């Protein structure tokens, strides 16, 4: 009796750990895969913090950004359905044994502000991330020790279909999002976002207070100063840093400013308050930008001139790169300077196109699906792309989940029917015997 109760407790613990891990891995893998460029940028943050930027080849970072989410997603699917019961617990423990010490290092030394384990969908502090990983590691160890208690949801005859479909699904989703844009945009520049509102600190909230620290040298001695005790000119400037003196409310959008390269004027307010349409060609690095659609981009600029819309190219490139881009593409549109990280956050395409009106993001396009002359048959006020389609998010959710759950549901039903058919035939055979 006591053994039976112990067996039941172990079974319950294994089931809880299994489904919690499955949910975390599926969600984590999915949000990483739908934003492969965001995952790539986060991996670069880690690599730079570790000092490996010049040691490892660049293609490894790109490949890792794509594979990491796929592995997590497939692992979650395998755990949920209880298939590959030998290798899956080992893989879970292996992943958590890598991630847990890594997040401890991040929590202690803070080389990156956000671990990126859930992409931009959910942001955790570094210590919260470490705590989460400790719990997941313990759960993985429970599964590894009592993996025989994992009850599969499908039979061995059809579990290969689950395994293959999980991989095929996330592979095509990741490929689509890499070629175009993430199907779910969790960043503050998503379609429907009001950029100006995203920069405001609500009434009653205290903003974060920062303090600038300056490192100066005199007679071989380095010392740190603030603005209040900044020394005389006998000290030589070495470096500076900004620290958080008092944590407060941080708006979703920070450091967003647009400087005209023609005269250095800050035109941020003019663009965000303009009631006319504004096209923003976002190219964080022109020397790395895809120039396969330059003719279409120039046609979009001509279209903007024809109907009186604004058109700016936002970049963080040097003047030399801008002049080279103009020479190679025949670009006549005005260029503006914006922070490199801000541009990467705005759109995951280089270049990409955004349509704004009164500071609200109406549309976003990758360089591979820019609107052409067949879509721009008149003024934007009369065209579908000239409206802010917030409802498309609902259809994206339905599309993504239908393509994932419906085939898996069909496979599960087929497996159930097969089990019943086999059981009935087996019983009939026994009766005849």
Regions found by a protein language model. Give the residues of each.
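Short, internal strand/loop/helix patches
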Residues: 311-312, 329-348
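Membrane-interface segments at or immediately adjacent to transmembrane helices
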Residues: 172-266
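Internal/C-terminal transmembrane anchor helices
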Residues: 154-183
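Functionalized membrane-embedded alpha-helices
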Residues: 13-33, 61-102
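Juxtamembrane interface at the cytosolic side of transmembrane helices
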Residues: 88, 289-295, 394-397, 401-433
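A short, hydrophobic beta-strand/beta-hairpin element that forms part of a small beta-sheet core
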Residues: 212-220, 351-365
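Short active-site neighborhood of thiol/selenol oxidoreductases, capturing the structured segment around
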Residues: 254-257, 268-288
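Membrane-embedded alpha-helical segments of integral membrane proteins
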Residues: 97-150
């Amino acid at each position: 009796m006591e053994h039976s109760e112990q067996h039941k407790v172990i079974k319950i613990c294994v089931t809880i750990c299994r489904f919690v891990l499955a949910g975390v891995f599926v969600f984590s893998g999915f949000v990483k895969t739908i934003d492969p460029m965001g995952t790539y940028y986060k991996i670069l943050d880690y690599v730079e913090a570790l000092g490996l930027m010049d040691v490892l080849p660049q293609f490894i970072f790109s490949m890792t950004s794509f594979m990491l989410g796929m592995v997590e997603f497939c692992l979650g699917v395998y755990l949920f359905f209880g298939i590959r019961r030998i290798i899956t617990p080992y893989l879970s423990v292996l992943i958590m044994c890598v991630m847990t010490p890594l997040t401890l290092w991040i929590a202690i030394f803070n080389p990156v502000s956000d671990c990126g384990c859930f992409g931009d969908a959910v942001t955790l502090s570094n210590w919260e991330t470490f705590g989460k990983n400790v719990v997941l590691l313990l759960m993985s160890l429970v599964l590894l020790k009592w993996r025989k208690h994992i009850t599969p949801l499908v039979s061995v005859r059809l579990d290969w279909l689950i395994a293959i479909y999980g991989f095929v699904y996330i592979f095509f989703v990741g490929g689509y999002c890499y070629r175009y844009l993430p199907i779910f945009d969790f960043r503050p520049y998503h379609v429907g976002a009001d950029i100006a509102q995203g920069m405001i600190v609500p009434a009653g909230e205290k903003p974060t207070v920062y303090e600038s620290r300056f490192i100066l040298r005199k007679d071989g001695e380095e010392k740190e100063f603030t603005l209040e005790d900044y020394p005389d000119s006998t000290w030589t400037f070495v470096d500076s840093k900004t620290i958080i003196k008092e944590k407060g409310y941080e708006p979703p959008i920070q450091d967003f400013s647009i400087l005209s390269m023609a005269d250095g004027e800050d035109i941020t307010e003019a663009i965000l308050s303009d009631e006319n349409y504004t096209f923003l060609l976002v190219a964080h690095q022109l020397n790395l930008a895809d120039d396969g659609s330059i003719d279409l981009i120039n046609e979009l600029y001509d279209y903007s001139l024809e109907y009186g819309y604004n058109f700016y190219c936002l970049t963080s490139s040097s003047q030399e790169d801008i002049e080279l881009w103009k020479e190679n593409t025949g670009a006549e549109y005005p260029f503006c300077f914006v922070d490199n990280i801000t541009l990467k956050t705005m759109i995951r395409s280089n270049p990409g196109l955004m349509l704004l009106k009164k500071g609200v993001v109406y549309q976003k396009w990758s360089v591979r699906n820019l609107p052409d002359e067949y879509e721009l048959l008149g003024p934007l006020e009369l065209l579908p792309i000239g409206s802010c389609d917030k409802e498309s998010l609902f259809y994206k959710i339905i599309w993504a989940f239908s393509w994932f759950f419906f085939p898996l549901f069909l496979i599960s039903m087929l497996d159930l029917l097969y089990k019943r058919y086999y059981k009935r035939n087996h019983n009939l055979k026994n009766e005849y015997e």
